[in-house]
Amino acid sequence: MFRQKFLSKDFITKIIEKAAGKVTRIMLEDFLSCIEKETALHYFTKSSESNLLRIIQNQFDIAFFINECLKYPHQIEILITLSNNSNYLTDILVRNPEYFHWIINPSVLEQKINGKYFKENLEKTVAPFKSIESKVNAIRNFKRKEILRIGLKDIYLKEELKNITLYLSFLANSISAILFELCYKEILNKHN
């Protein structure tokens, strides 16, 4: 794909349609200008633009989103980095737009994570649920959220590959252990 020097007219039109009547013209122009400045620092393609548009269009409150992006420029940097580098991480934010406000918190992104962290938080996540289906769904959501964090540690914070691999291993081990325990209990309940 070829690098885009400017945002497409289609992108701008769709953002204007989404934000119409919710933010001032000046705020919208500033927002688009900030996006364009940040995209100039990356190898931004049509695919990247499409990813970015999907993320923005799926925000619950576009006025709040634009206002926050203008107040905290690192949010636009995270958006561009993510949409430019990963379709998978983009899909996570499209499916769960609320994760964006979680992940932009520097304390969340920079938090040191290890096997103990994943194990304890995964146990807390599934504890309130009774059925195996709801527990598995909670595990799925936890996995998506943590994959987003690990992915951004890689592409945004530029952490070492060794650490990223370690985080993914910790996450996989924790998920495997809790799933094994759930399945084991389910089988015991069925045969007792």
Predicted regions and their residues:
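Non-catalytic regulatory/linker segments of enzymes
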Residues: 1-192
